[in-house]
């Protein structure tokens, strides 16, 4: 009987843990940049995405161009989507290592861009 109760409690605990994980808000970093060479910039961002994957970091990078944005039309936006702020901190730490592939790619990216805006957004759950 004790094993049945313990098993039931374990199942409830796992269910609650899964529900909590599902409801955790996603964090989105939105970076507006100026770059003279969008094609090279996109290539370096794609390289960085692959390096994050190799490192096992759950990061999704996307490059956007504003098309209906008034005076900001044409602005290049990079979004960095991570599960939470703790993961974002791990990503920043990994990027700061100068002798790593991630650090080398960031140096190349920094050389061909100027950041004009940098914001963090947290997903609102319905």
Regions of interest found by a model, annotated:
Residues 29-65, 76:
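N-terminal targeting signals for Sec/Tat export/insertion, comprising classic cleavable signal peptides
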Residues 32, 79-81, 119-122:
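Soluble periplasmic/extracytoplasmic beta-strand elements of cell-envelope proteins
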Residues 46-62, 71-72, 81-118:
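An amphipathic, aromatic/His-enriched active-site/gating alpha helix that lines ligand/cofactor pockets
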Residues 124-126:
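Short, solvent-exposed mixed-charge patches
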Residues 21-25:
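Boundary of Sec targeting at the N-terminus
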Residues 1-9:
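Bacterial N-terminal signal peptides that target proteins for export
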């Amino acid at each position: 009987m004790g094993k049945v109760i313990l098993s039931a409690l374990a199942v409830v605990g796992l269910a609650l843990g899964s529900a909590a994980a599902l409801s955790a808000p996603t964090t989105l970093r939105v970076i507006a940049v100026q770059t003279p060479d969008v094609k090279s910039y996109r290539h370096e961002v794609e390289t960085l995405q692959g390096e994050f994957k190799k490192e096992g970091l759950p990061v999704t990078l996307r490059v956007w161009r504003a098309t209906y944005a008034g005076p900001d039309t044409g602005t290049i936006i990079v979004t960095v989507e991570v599960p939470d702020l703790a993961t974002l901190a791990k990503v920043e730490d990994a990027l700061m290592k100068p002798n790593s592939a991630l650090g080398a790619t960031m140096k190349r990216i920094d050389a061909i861009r100027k950041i004009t805006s940098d914001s963090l957004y947290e997903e609102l759950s319905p």
